[in-house]
């Protein structure tokens, strides 16, 4: 999945004509060097494109208008090399609907103490030019990010890369289509929500399809295509005897391959990048889609069980953010606890649908086993564990007057004991700051039982994503205390009531 190849961020230098052509030419010469260096040496996920210098209100407004309508542009990165009076930016910023990053840098890293004169001071005015630009952003109550540091600094590179990933995720959010196969699991509350409000807030659309619409595509899959896909399975995974050729569950595997091919075609034909299923809506399917869902997630699709469209969309967004990074991202559910002094653990899993991108094993085990829910034939699934390391769980919930993005930082651990009778993929973690505090804070905040689990994407990216969309962000980590957490929720309640 290469979602960044066709994207670009526009690098924009603001100034004014009173500096004269010689100074302005030096500004652009420096800008060319900065952009070329960032593109070639900073490891950025998205290409920077240097735009012509803007020195008038009309030029700025025209550039912002062009950015809005250019589908390749996912955001604007500004640098105030000199002083650019910020009233010139009001018209452009008032219509800009792409993410905005102010790179508060300067061409020279250190002050040339021996030679610095007023010409040098006149040219290198980021220190106060950036403050003028920052004021108008604050005055207009506009969300924009600020990164301070020299353009050759590795930390600045890393933060710019993070911002680019989130900007790309916002672009994806605005064009994302989510398909729901069936409806919500009956009587479940947290997987419901206002889909119209979500489309207004995030841009993505959510529409339901009768299971018969999917079944028609599944039934049209040819035997030849099934055989080809099963050959891919055999090359990619370890098989139990039951699913090998002539095994007693081989037919179930073939049915699973048919379902995968049908689901893939349905999603591709409709332009969907996320979807949900529901074990209560399976009429016409021989088994609950398990293997199909796992493999589609690994290809970058978002997924939510039991009709959970918010988690499906969020998973797709994190898949985009994490493209090319080490570690995977998966649909997840807190399933059961290990209460043990000094070793409290959470086992995360689901009935079947855990993404192999988080698998520790190079070749997960493919098996068919009984599933005592859904009333269908035994489904195929991939079974694996998850490597140790830092991770997070994220949940997007509808609070009625706002959306809340809740994140818990966790530490994934190696599976401490064999699980010979557990026929599903799983991750095991220690919640920060402790199981007790994390669980209580999560429950108090109304966090869902479904989450997006990621070992690729970090807290900073998710906080920035929430800021870009103007939604609430709550973090549970090693610094969390319940009294402070409860107070934050109370303060947020007041803020979002006043900010409606």
From Swiss-Prot:
<feature type="binding site">
    <location>
        <position position="350"/>
    </location>
    <ligand>
        <name>Mn(2+)</name>
    </ligand>
</feature>
<dbReference type="InterPro" id="IPR055389">
    <property type="entry name" value="AraA_N"/>
</dbReference>
<comment type="pathway">
    <text>Carbohydrate degradation; L-arabinose degradation via L-ribulose; D-xylulose 5-phosphate from L-arabinose (bacterial route): step 1/3.</text>
</comment>
<keyword id="KW-0479">Metal-binding</keyword>
<keyword id="KW-0464">Manganese</keyword>
<dbReference type="InterPro" id="IPR004216">
    <property type="entry name" value="Fuc/Ara_isomerase_C"/>
</dbReference>
<dbReference type="InterPro" id="IPR055390">
    <property type="entry name" value="AraA_central"/>
</dbReference>
<dbReference type="InterPro" id="IPR009015">
    <property type="entry name" value="Fucose_isomerase_N/cen_sf"/>
</dbReference>
<feature type="binding site">
    <location>
        <position position="306"/>
    </location>
    <ligand>
        <name>Mn(2+)</name>
    </ligand>
</feature>
<dbReference type="InterPro" id="IPR038583">
    <property type="entry name" value="AraA_N_sf"/>
</dbReference>
<comment type="subunit">
    <text>Homohexamer.</text>
</comment>
<comment type="similarity">
    <text>Belongs to the arabinose isomerase family.</text>
</comment>
<dbReference type="Pfam" id="PF24856">
    <property type="entry name" value="AraA_central"/>
</dbReference>
<dbReference type="GO" id="GO:0005829">
    <property type="term" value="C:cytosol"/>
</dbReference>
<protein>
    <recommendedName>
        <fullName>L-arabinose isomerase</fullName>
        <ecNumber>5.3.1.4</ecNumber>
    </recommendedName>
</protein>
<dbReference type="Pfam" id="PF11762">
    <property type="entry name" value="Arabinose_Iso_C"/>
</dbReference>
<feature type="binding site">
    <location>
        <position position="450"/>
    </location>
    <ligand>
        <name>Mn(2+)</name>
    </ligand>
</feature>
<keyword id="KW-0413">Isomerase</keyword>
<dbReference type="InterPro" id="IPR024664">
    <property type="entry name" value="Ara_Isoase_C"/>
</dbReference>
<dbReference type="InterPro" id="IPR003762">
    <property type="entry name" value="Lara_isomerase"/>
</dbReference>
<comment type="function">
    <text>Catalyzes the conversion of L-arabinose to L-ribulose.</text>
</comment>
<keyword id="KW-0054">Arabinose catabolism</keyword>
<dbReference type="GO" id="GO:0019569">
    <property type="term" value="P:L-arabinose catabolic process to xylulose 5-phosphate"/>
</dbReference>
<feature type="binding site">
    <location>
        <position position="333"/>
    </location>
    <ligand>
        <name>Mn(2+)</name>
    </ligand>
</feature>
<dbReference type="GO" id="GO:0008733">
    <property type="term" value="F:L-arabinose isomerase activity"/>
</dbReference>
<dbReference type="GO" id="GO:0030145">
    <property type="term" value="F:manganese ion binding"/>
</dbReference>
<dbReference type="Pfam" id="PF02610">
    <property type="entry name" value="AraA_N"/>
</dbReference>
<keyword id="KW-0119">Carbohydrate metabolism</keyword>
């Amino acid at each position: 999945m290469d979602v960044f190849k066709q994207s670009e961020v526009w690098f924009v230098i603001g100034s004014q004509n009173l500096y004269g052509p010689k100074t302005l030419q030096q500004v652009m010469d420096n800008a060319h060097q900065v952009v070329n260096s960032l593109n070639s040496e900073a490891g950025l996920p998205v290409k920077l494109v240097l735009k012509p210098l803007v020195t008038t209100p009309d030029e700025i407004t025209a550039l912002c208008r062009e950015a809005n309508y250019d589908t390749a542009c996912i955001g604007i990165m500004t640098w105030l090399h000199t002083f650019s009076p910020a009233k010139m930016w009001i018209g452009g910023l008032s219509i800009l609907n792409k993410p905005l990053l102010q790179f508060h840098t300067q061409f020279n890293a250190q002050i040339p103490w021996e030679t610095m004169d007023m010409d040098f001071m006149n040219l290198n005015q980021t220190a106060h030019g950036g403050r003028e630009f920052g004021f108008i952003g604050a005055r207009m109550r506009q969300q924009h990010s600020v990164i301070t540091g020299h353009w050759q600094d590795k930390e600045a590179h890393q933060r710019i890369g993070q911002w680019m990933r989130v900007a790309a995720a916002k672009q994806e959010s605005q064009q994302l289509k989510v398909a729901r196969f069936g409806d919500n699991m009956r009587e479940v509350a947290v997987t419901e929500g206002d889909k119209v409000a979500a489309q207004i807030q995030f841009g993505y659309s959510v529409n339901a399809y009768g299971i018969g619409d999917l079944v028609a595509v599944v039934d049209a899959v040819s035997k030849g295509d099934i055989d080809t896909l099963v050959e891919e399975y055999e090359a990619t995974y370890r098989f139990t005897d039951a699913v090998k050729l002539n095994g007693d569950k081989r037919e179930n595997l073939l049915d699973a391959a048919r379902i995968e091919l049908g689901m893939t075609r349905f999603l591709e034909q409709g332009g969907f990048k996320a979807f949900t299923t529901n074990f209560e809506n399976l009429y016409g399917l021989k088994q609950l889609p398990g293997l199909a869902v796992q493999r589609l997630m690994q290809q970058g699709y978002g997924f939510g069980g039991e009709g959970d469209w918010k988690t499906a969309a969020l998973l797709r967004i994190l898949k985009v953010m994490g493209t090319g990074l080490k570690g995977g991202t998966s649909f997840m559910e807190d399933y059961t606890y290990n209460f043990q002094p000094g070793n409290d653990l959470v086992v995360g899993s689901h009935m079947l649908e855990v993404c192999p991108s988080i698998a520790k094993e190079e070749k997960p085990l493919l098996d068919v086993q009984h599933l005592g829910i859904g009333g269908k034939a035994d489904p195929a699934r991939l079974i694996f564990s998850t490597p140790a390391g830092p991770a997070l769980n994220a949940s997007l919930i509808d609070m009625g007057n706002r959306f809340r993005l809740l994140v818990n930082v966790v530490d994934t651990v190696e599976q401490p004991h064999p699980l010979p009778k557990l026929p599903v993929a799983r991750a095991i973690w220690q919640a920060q700051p402790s199981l007790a505090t994390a669980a209580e804070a999560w429950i108090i905040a109304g966090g869902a039982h479904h989450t997006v689990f990621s070992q690729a994407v970090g807290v900073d990216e998710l906080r920035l994503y929430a800021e870009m969309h103007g939604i609430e962000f709550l973090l549970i980590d090693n610094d969390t205390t319940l009294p402070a957490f409860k107070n934050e929720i109370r303060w947020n309640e007041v803020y979002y009531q006043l900010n409606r």
